[in-house]
Structures are given as C-alpha cells and as structure tokens.
Regions:
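Mid-chain, well-packed structural core segment of small domains
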Residues: 67-69, 79-86
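C-terminal edge strands of extracellular/lumenal beta-sandwich accessory domains
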Residues: 103-118
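Short, intrinsically disordered N-terminal pre-domain segments
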Residues: 1-16, 114-118
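Surface-exposed ligand/attachment interfaces on beta-rich extracellular proteins
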Residues: 11-31, 42-55, 61, 75-82, ...
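Surface-exposed loop/edge segments in extracytoplasmic proteins
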Residues: 7-12, 62-71
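Short loop/turn segments immediately following beta-strands, especially the blade-tip
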Residues: 60-61, 117
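Short beta-strand segments enriched in hydrophobic/aromatic residues
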Residues: 41-43, 98-100, 112-114
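Noncatalytic modules at the cell exterior or secretory-pathway interfaces
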Residues: 33-39, 87-106
Length: 118
C-alpha cells in the first residue's frame, strides 16, 4: 500500500519587519505519522545585521511549545536560507517561530509535508 502525504501551508510568504517575530499556524499531527517542516527566509538588498532565527517546537497539546530545534539564518544581502526539520512520529503538535534580527525586513514562509497514512 502506498503512503499518503499531505502538503500544508503554515505561513504564506510575507514580509517580517526588523526586530519582530511571527508564529506559523500550528500543525496538528495527533493522528498522523510525522512530518517535514520547511521554512524559507529571504534577506533583502539590505541584509539584517543580526541573523534571523527559526525555532521548531513540539508539544503534547495544542499551544504547548517544547523546543525541538533552533537554527539561524545569515546576514548576507539577498541570500535565501532554507531550513527543514524532521518531526518524528511521536510529535503531536508542531509550532514554528521566526524571529527577525535587529535591522531590515526579511521575507518568510513555512510549509509542511505531513505523512497521514502508511
């Protein structure tokens, strides 16, 4: 039997102002077998002076955030940073927070590939 996978949009492409953060839509995996969560950060022509960070959380209930993985982007003008986090099958709820650096806006987006049946 073939596996069933579902694409999810957690955060549509949007500008994130300097020194601000955004939370992606929570991903409910309580009836799924895990997921890959991908975040894309694009710096503008004026790069941030402090690297933006992406934090992936898992939790046993909706809204619970227990840090699974954190990664930082770069401070290079016009660069694109893609980060992928493998959410294991025991993960029930997934949250992603993107924190921008101190100067200049960036563009952010987040997607997931959910394994729904095996």
């Amino acid at each position: 039997m073939a596996a069933t996978k579902t694409s999810r949009t957690l955060l549509t492409s949007q500008s994130l102002a300097a020194a601000t953060s955004v939370n992606a839509t929570e991903l409910n995996l309580s009836t799924a077998y895990g997921a890959l969560v991908a975040v894309k950060i694009t710096n503008g022509a004026s790069a941030p002076t402090t690297a933006p960070t992406v934090t992936f959380y898992v939790g046993e209930a909706t809204g619970v955030k227990r840090k699974l993985y954190q990664v930082a982007g770069d401070t290079v003008a016009n660069s694109v940073n893609d980060f992928v986090c493998d959410i294991p099958s025991p993960g029930m709820f997934v949250n992603v927070t993107i924190l921008n650096g101190a100067t200049n806006a960036i563009t952010v987006e987040a997607y997931a590939q959910e394994l729904t049946t095996i």
